[in-house]
Amino acid sequence: MSKQSITTAKATAIKRILAFVYDLFLIIPLMMLAALIWLPFNNGVAIEPGNPLYPFMISTTAILTPILFYTYFWYKGGQTLGMRSWKLRIVNLSGTPLSSKQSATRAVLLILSLTLIAVGFNTAFALNFTVQAIIPLGLALISLFGMCQTFAKRRTSLVDLLTQTRIVQLPKVEKPKK
């Protein structure tokens, strides 16, 4: 396939989601390792829920770890390990690799979207899906809608539109026959 056909081949939403799930198997252990950074701040003992540092530690680790993970992989090669498994790559609209600014912005927007989804659904569940749950559930659904390939004729996600990027499907590489 030529460069033009690679950059125009659209990645399906299912493959994007599956690549994200694969990435979670890397991000969750990385978050556990990142939590070790906080041990010296508590005399080498794990920080437990009653500790005043606990909310700060949890939120900082949960937000920064995936942002750094995605920024690094998207900047270095346009692919995370999950994306590589599904032959997906993130490129500029011109088909070139992402800049560090685009990678970081895209990672922050992804984590922000996921946070809105989580907060919205958690609040809706806590309110037993009553009338008061309409606003948080609506925010969650809007964020989820924005992550999907639903905008414009090109079916790009909101994150793609804001960062001037897109996820493309790479061609299947033929293995040489022996």
Regions found by a protein language model. Name each.
Residues M1-K178:
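Membrane-interfacial and juxtamembrane segments of integral membrane proteins
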